[in-house]
């Protein structure tokens, strides 16, 4: 086993300007390629110096104290929600899915139902960031109502530390893939080093992603980073209906055309009811 090392870098010493016009940033809050090279050089230098000094130190990922407080508060709320399921304390195999459900389809239902058979308890974190066609409240309701019969499944808001503009802004830039950031490191490190241990999650489930480059890369990164913490990443094949892979993007295109007959093939009645409320079918006809 290699020695572990805790490395702290002061970005102010790397870049004294620290503003969006500086060479350090390519966008506000995200460093440029050149900055990455500088940081890598700083890290390598520290590793070499620490090795030469022979210090035994701990290399670990840490988040800022103010965010740590917010994360702890979120996790405490999640734990309280989970305890509403009386059987949860008996479960020794816990899995999780983080999903957007924009909108909730038979494909999402299939992924959840399949995963629920592979663990005692399954946590579904619905992406809370309101950057989708359907607001969080509607998406959360779709998932809640569409999985009500699955007794070992608990539906939860994702908070600001799972697939959010704070942890993985590129997820919400899919319409401009050439501009999207594929940097999911922060998101996955928070999950593997804070969220999963706190909630005793040992498996994370994802659906195969044949279309979306951002999500596909996210799944690949997940297998590497979560694997380092002995968290199994299980990829489940996508559901097909009439030889068509069920995906939310297609449903949204059907909604633009008000093709309700086609939509009915791919979404549960619980989702259909919410869609009709949202799009006010009576007025559109």
Model-based region annotation:
Residues 25-29:
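Second-shell loop/turn segments in exported
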Residues 31-35:
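Accessory beta->alpha helical hairpin/"wing" motif in late/C-terminal subdomains of nucleic-acid enzymes
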């Amino acid at each position: 086993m290699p020695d572990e090392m805790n490395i702290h870098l002061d970005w102010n010493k790397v870049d004294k300007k620290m503003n969006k016009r500086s060479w350090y940033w390519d966008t506000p809050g995200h460093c440029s390629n050149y900055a990455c090279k500088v940081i890598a050089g700083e890290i390598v230098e520290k590793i070499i110096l620490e090795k030469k000094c022979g210090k035994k130190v701990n290399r670990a990922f840490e988040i800022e104290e103010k965010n740590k407080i917010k994360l702890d508060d979120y996790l405490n709320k999640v734990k309280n929600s989970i305890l509403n399921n009386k059987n949860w304390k008996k479960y020794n195999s816990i899995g999780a899915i983080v999903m957007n459900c924009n909108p909730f389809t038979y494909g999402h239902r299939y992924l959840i139902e399949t995963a629920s058979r592979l663990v005692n308890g399954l946590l579904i974190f619905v992406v809370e960031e309101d950057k989708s066609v359907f607001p969080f409240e509607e998406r959360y309701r779709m998932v809640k109502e569409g999985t009500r019969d699955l007794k070992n499944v608990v539906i939860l808001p994702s908070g600001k530390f799972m697939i959010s503009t704070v942890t993985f802004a590129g997820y919400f830039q899919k319409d401009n893939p050439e501009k999207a950031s594929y940097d999911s490191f922060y998101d996955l490190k928070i999950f593997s080093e804070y969220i999963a241990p706190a909630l005793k999650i040992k498996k994370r489930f994802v659906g195969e992603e044949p279309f979306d480059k951002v999500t596909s890369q996210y799944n690949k990164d997940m297998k590497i980073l979560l694997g380092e913490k002995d968290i199994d990443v299980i990829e489940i094949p996508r559901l097909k209906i009439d030889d068509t892979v069920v995906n939310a993007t297609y449903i949204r295109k059907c909604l633009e055309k008000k093709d309700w007959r086609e939509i009915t093939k791919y979404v549960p009645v619980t989702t259909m009811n919410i869609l009709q409320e949202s799009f006010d079918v009576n007025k559109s006809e």
